[in-house]
């Protein structure tokens, strides 16, 4: 029985040499995707371009670019400027703010009109899960328990069914840390997300 697809993700602000080495190694080990995030002012697309130059087959994901701080035109420009390979790109977007559903729907439509690549939507709440199932090629879960992930997956499938197409592929971040301070780093990250209202709910 074949194993499930596995991805490897890094903080986009880490040193480029680390991105290069990890991207090469992930591809050599058979990982199916290599991801970076897009935190604050750190450009995830630029970090992903570093990985793209070191690899030939592995899918390349950015998860996710917040549409309330970077609009579709800026994202399109970034993808083109960095010459990201569209056949391998997993372009992740999301929005946690009020008006998120409309912003994500419009953003996905604009990106789809401008790029022939796979679009991934970050989904947490039930309405966003259903919307992601309707409009996206992939859905990214973050900081979910297995039970919450199963319920969210059902909502994604329901959205896809209403739209009349197959469900998108599901992705999930599973965080880990190594070293003597690993537990402390994970606890700090969990506390940071717990302070975000959408996750606290």
What are these regions (language model features)?
Residues 1-201:
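Active-site-adjacent structural elements that line small-molecule/cofactor binding pockets in enzymes
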């Amino acid at each position: 029985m074949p194993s499930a697809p596995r991805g490897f993700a890094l903080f986009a602000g880490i040193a480029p040499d680390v991105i290069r080495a990890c991207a090469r190694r992930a591809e050599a080990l058979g990982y199916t995707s290599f991801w970076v995030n897009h935190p604050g002012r750190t450009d995830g697309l630029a970090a992903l371009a570093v990985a793209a130059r070191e690899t030939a087959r592995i899918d390349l994901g950015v998860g996710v670019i917040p549409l309330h701080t970077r609009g579709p035109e800026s994202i399109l420009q970034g993808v083109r400027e960095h010459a990201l390979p569209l056949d391998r790109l997993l372009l992740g977007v999301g929005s946690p703010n009020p008006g998120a559903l409309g912003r994500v729907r419009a953003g996905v439509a604009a990106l789809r009109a401008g790029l022939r690549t796979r679009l991934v939507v970050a989904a947490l709440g039930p309405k966003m899960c259903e919307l992601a199932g309707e409009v996206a090629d992939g859905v990214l879960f973050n900081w979910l328990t297995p039970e919450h992930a199963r319920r969210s997956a059902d909502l994604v499938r329901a959205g896809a069914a209403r739209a009349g197409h197959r469900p998108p592929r599901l992705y999930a971040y599973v965080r880990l840390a190594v070293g003597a301070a690993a537990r402390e780093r994970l606890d700090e990250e969990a506390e940071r997300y717990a302070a975000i209202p959408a996750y606290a709910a």
